[in-house]
């Protein structure tokens, strides 16, 4: 099984880099109008983009969203990302750690990040595996120890699992996560005196307000909305499928999901803890819009993956451009800091207006 997972990780990297896997429909952030300040009353050079997330100070509200791990090629990618986030004082998440839990030889493809950064690093485990594979608090402990994680993302990916040839389909009984997360912090927080925040993470399909209510009840500390508009994992799996009938079936779901902006607005109705916006974040203005409507931080994945394949310097340049654009947008809105941005006025129009 470990070889199958390792090969699948490599296929995912190849498809994401060389195939068209992005949604054709947008994030609906284009339907968010930020309010220009004709006066500004700010000094562009003094704009403060820093935030505190999960007890870590970040230079900007940006994390490199979970991308990869579990293959030798992934080690170099995670290394390049870690170098970049350390340079810029940002955060990152690793890809699903299941491969390394099955095959310990793959652990270094994840743990390499701690050779290059002490910044915020989030672990990653699949929600479905707690049901299908009987994972528990000990599994979480192993994943945390593997990368000295500052938080643990539990990802929900029903669409990908439904289309993936090797998919796990049983998400029934996800309520078991409540006891598992509580037991983890009771057992291991006492030993390390380090409470691990748990993040419910979508991977491109988005969460609804009903989802947010359930996740809040389960005790999650944060929600990463992972809305549609960026990478479509249905598209990624479409390119992997060999059978033509299965391809036709999967093609119907290439545009499925709640757009990122809509998911932010949905989730914040029933969740008052940190919201992370991922899914089609492609500019500093996207970050500003996401935070104005309810996010506390944003994540970027696919553009960083492509840059990381070239090297850490390309990752740094890419994210520096995002930060510069974010600062300029805040300056034009008259926002000196992120708190002011998060409390700024905005206008919702067109299709996004139908979600509120």
UniProtKB/Swiss-Prot annotation:
Tagged with keyword NADP: yes
Main location group: cytoplasm
Entry's localization field: Cytoplasm
Reaction(s) catalysed (UniProt annotation): isopentenyl diphosphate = dimethylallyl diphosphate
Cofactor: FMN; NADPH; Mg(2+)
Positions annotated to bind Mg(2+): 161
Family matches, as CDD domains: IDI-2_FMN
Ligand binding (FMN): 66-68, 96, 124, 201, 231, 280-282, 301-302
Pfam families: FMN_dh (PF01070)
Record key words, sorted: Cytoplasm, Flavoprotein, FMN, Isomerase, Isoprene biosynthesis, Magnesium, Metal-binding, NADP
GO cellular component terms listed in the entry, alphabetical order: cytoplasm
EC primary class: isomerase
Subunit structure: Homooctamer. Dimer of tetramers.
Protein name: Isopentenyl-diphosphate delta-isomerase
Gene expressing this chain: fni
């Amino acid at each position: 099984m470990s070889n199958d997972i390792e090969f699948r990780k490599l296929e995912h990297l190849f498809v994401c880099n060389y195939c068209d896997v992005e949604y054709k429909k947008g994030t609906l952030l284009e339907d968010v109008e930020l309010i220009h300040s004709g006066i500004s009353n700010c000094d562009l050079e003094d704009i403060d983009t820093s935030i505190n997330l999960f007890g870590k100070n970040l230079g900007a509200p940006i994390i490199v969203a979970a991308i990869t791990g579990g293959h030798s090629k992934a080690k170099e990618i995670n290394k390049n990302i870690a170098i970049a986030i350390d340079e810029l004082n940002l955060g990152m998440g690793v890809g699903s750690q299941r491969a390394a839990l099955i095959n310990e030889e793959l652990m270094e493809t994840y743990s390499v990040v701690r050779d290059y950064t002490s910044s915020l690093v989030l672990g990653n485990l699949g929600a479905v595996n707690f049901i299908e594979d009987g994972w528990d608090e000990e599994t979480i402990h192993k994943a945390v120890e593997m990368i000295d994680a500052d938080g643990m993302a539990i990802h929900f990916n029903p669409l990908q699992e439904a289309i993936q040839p090797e998919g796990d389909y049983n998400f029934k009984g996800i309520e078991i996560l409540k006891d598992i997360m509580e037991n983890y912090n009771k057992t291991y927080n006492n030993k390390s005196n380090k409470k691990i925040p748990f993040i419910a993470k979508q991977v491109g399909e988005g969460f609804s307000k009903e989802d947010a209510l359930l996740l809040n009840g389960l005790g999650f500390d944060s929600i990463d909305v992972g809305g549609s508009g960026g990478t479509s994992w249905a598209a990624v799996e479409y390119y992997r499928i060999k059978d033509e009938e299965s391809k036709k079936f999967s093609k119907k779901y290439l545009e499925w999901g709640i757009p990122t902006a809509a998911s932010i607005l949905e989730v914040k109705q029933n969740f008052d803890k940190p919201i992370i916006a991922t899914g089609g974040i492609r500019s500093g203005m996207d970050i500003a819009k996401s935070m104005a409507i309810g996010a506390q931080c944003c994540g970027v994945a696919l553009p960083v993956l492509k840059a990381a394949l070239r090297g850490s310097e390309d990752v740094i340049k890419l994210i520096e451009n995002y930060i510069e654009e974010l600062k300029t947008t805040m300056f034009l809105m008259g926002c000196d800091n992120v708190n002011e941005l998060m409390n700024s006025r905005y206008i919702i129009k067109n299709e996004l207006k139908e979600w509120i």
